[in-house]
Amino acid sequence: MSGQGPPSNLTPQQQHMIMQQQQQQQMMRQQQIQQQQLHQRQLQQQQAQQSYQRSRTPQMQQHPGGGSPGSHLQMHPHLQSQGHMQPRSPLVGQHHPAPGSIPPGNPATPQMMQQQMGMNQPMSLPAPHVSRPGSVAPPASVPPNMHTGPSSNQMDQMGGQSQYSHHLQPQQPLSRPGSQQSHIAGGHGGPHSVQQPGSVLAPGSIQQPGSLLAPGSMHQPGSVQQPGSLGAPLSHTGAGGPQSVQGYGPGSVQPPGSAQAPSSVQPGSTFAPGSLQAPASQQPPASIQPPPSAASGSVAGPASAAPAKVEPLKPNEEQIRMVQDPVDLVRNLVQKDLRMSVVEMNKRGAELLHQKEEGAIKEEDRQQYKRATNDFHAVCDEIDRTLTTIMETAKQITKLDKVFQDRTSKEIDGEAMVNSVQKFVDETGIVQKMFDDTVNSVTSTMEKMRRRQKKWKDQQQQQENAEDAEMAE
């Protein structure tokens, strides 16, 4: 079957299945060859490890006269042969051993290696595929700093260009249609996992987890295809650089119709531009949202800035006084408001005295004198309130300084600190009570004054009505 192409009368999906089976058989043969190489390498490492352990273990033997008892232990590691110096793979670090490597002091048997390779196998692999070539220990030509991921990830970064043609094949055997694919939960090769000419990817290896979906990732036809994406050839250019692959076919990165469906979208992962996606997910809302949001933001900018162009209300005199320095406020009140109010009050009073001497006092001049007198009293009250605020603030600052005195030179224990703060809080409460009493007194006075004014107006209205009634009679 591997030497013949699929019949032309088959549907694209059937042709895809036939090509997958052919590629699967090729990968099985490659896996058998790599397993044999693995066994040979394991035997060599095991022999080297046993020899290394024997050279490091003291032996109970008779020493000839004149020789030191520990002369047979004087062989240093730097004097041994190169085979004894490499009991482990160069990629196996001290704290990050590769899954397929043999740790020192614990030689593994072929059965144990088969068990380890079986554990590294994806869940979607069929039963005959027991081992994965991804668990093969990397060669000694790889630098020691390339051991950050699983062994299959290490193999993605090493090797030569001899197996570069395998990158065009699916990365893992096809499982039954409808079964869940462990590639979804396993790993996804990003654009960086598309192998460069100097890298080799073993068939069936799992890409690095958390990375972007690579063009080389393979998905099940039953779980990733949609009816609308099975017919037309979907040839997309990968965005991974010169190493990316275009089109599809027997050696393409993705089979025809293997569009990425929404059901296989991994949480927290994004798709590379070269990955094929379903028509419903080729243009996700997230890729369309930024331009409208930017446009709407630019449109909403002038609209939101329009209210700022409206001229703000000018603050009244009371608001200006609240944000001023109290000392400056008192100075302005004394130098300007107080003087003007005194002059105005004296002027109105002089006019009333002149009219009184003449014997005819105008009601309008009397009201103006009352208004000038009220203004003078208001200025005096404002000065008194501001000076009181300044003095009370100075007292509070002095009390607060006593609470934190000598704090920079020495630490105050908890009890003394609580006592000082409690005293300050009590004194602050007394001042607050004084303010509350003053406000309540002013409020009650204003209420009484308004009630009296209303009562006086009612009496005046009744008198006018009575006078009108008498005149009418």
UniProtKB/Swiss-Prot annotation:
Top-level lineage group: Eukaryota
Provide the protein's localization: Nucleus
Q: Which UniProt keywords apply?
A: Activator, Nucleus, Transcription, Transcription regulation
- Gene Ontology terms: cellular component: mediator complex
NADP is among the record's keywords: no
Chief place where the protein resides: nucleus
Positions of the UniProt region annotated as Disordered: 1-319, 444-473
What segments bear the compositional bias annotation Polar residues?
Answer: 1-12, 51-62, 148-183, 255-269
Biased composition (Low complexity) is annotated at 13-50, 111-123, 130-139, 272-286, 294-308
Q: How does it assemble?
A: Component of the Mediator complex.
Q: Which family does it belong to?
A: Belongs to the Mediator complex subunit 29 family.
Tell me, what does this protein do in biology?
A: Component of the Mediator complex, a coactivator involved in the regulated transcription of nearly all RNA polymerase II-dependent genes. Mediator functions as a bridge to convey information from gene-specific regulatory proteins to the basal RNA polymerase II transcription machinery. Mediator is recruited to promoters by direct interactions with regulatory proteins and serves as a scaffold for the assembly of a functional preinitiation complex with RNA polymerase II and the general transcription factors.
What is the name of this protein? Mediator of RNA polymerase II transcription subunit 29
Which organism was this protein described from? Caenorhabditis briggsae
